A protein has these predicted regions:
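Hydrophobic, aromatic-enriched alpha-helical segments typical of multi-pass transmembrane helices
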Residues: 1-238, 243-246
Length: 246
């Protein structure tokens, strides 16, 4: 949904080059104002769903073995911050289409939006590090039934590492480390998509397993209750017969 709004509708992939002048940037946002507005609206709705996704991951993490509580709530907190970073950037781009502005103001707004979108790597890095560490704690000592497979922990660690190049985009106006470059845009974007899809699939599988386990536990609990009730009934009948004999 986010890619539909950001890429297909708004046309922000590939991103506007950092070397564009204020006049060129103003012309771009004026010519495509309607599609950018609509694309940003769709992207805003999609960005909000990241909060629910982070909450779902947190619930799953709280079921893991080991002391993962702090890691789970860290994931929830930085997931919420991640949503804000997306939303603020999208609102800035929307406001650039709202009225005619000085070219230098447009440049400053666009720079700020892209730095928010690309350069703040600390939150996704901390989120993936927290998830990966929790997975390793859950799978240590050869636990037979981990929530997520151990390789998912390595995936999260690698994702954290591959997000790192975006941090230095502020030093470059062109090349692979600019905000539209290979290492700061296309690589993290691809990695982010793979990570989201992989973790979502793992959550769906885990959800089914946890639900089946909960149903089995519930069935076992119901059976135990029935056995206790049956024993109580047998004891009551035995006591009644004993009194009748007396």
């Amino acid at each position: 949904m986010f890619l539909a709004g950001f890429w297909v509708i708004a046309g922000f992939i590939p991103p506007p080059a950092p070397k564009l002048t204020g006049e060129q940037l103003g012309q771009l946002f004026t010519q495509h104002a309607v599609r950018i507005r609509i694309g940003m609206i769709v992207s805003l709705f999609a960005s909000a769903l990241l909060a629910s996704w982070s909450a779902a991951i947190t619930i799953v993490m709280l079921r893991m073995r080991g002391r993962v509580g702090a890691l789970a709530y860290t994931n929830l907190a930085v997931g919420a911050l991640f949503v804000l970073e997306f939303i603020i950037s999208l609102i800035i781009w929307q406001s650039m289409t709202y009225r005619s502005r000085d070219p230098q103001v447009l440049l400053a707004m666009n720079d700020t939006a892209w730095f928010l979108f690309v350069c703040i790597t600390s939150t996704p890095m901390l989120q993936t590090f927290a998830i990966g560490t929790a997975i390793f704690l859950d799978t240590q000592d050869g636990h037979p039934d981990p929530i997520f497979p151990r390789w998912a922990g390595y995936l999260n660690y690698w994702v954290a590492v591959l997000f790192t190049p975006g941090t230095i985009a502020v030093f470059f106006h062109d090349g692979p480390f600019a905000w539209n470059g290979l290492f700061t845009w296309y690589l993290p974007l691809t990695v982010f998509a793979i990570w989201m899809i992989t973790m979502s699939v793992l959550m769906l599988k885990t959800g089914g397993a946890l639900e089946a386990g909960a149903q089995a536990y519930s069935a076992g609990t119901d059976l135990a209750d029935e056995v206790r009730q049956l024993r109580a009934e047998v004891a009551r009948l035995a006591a009644g017969r004993k009194e009748a004999r007396l």
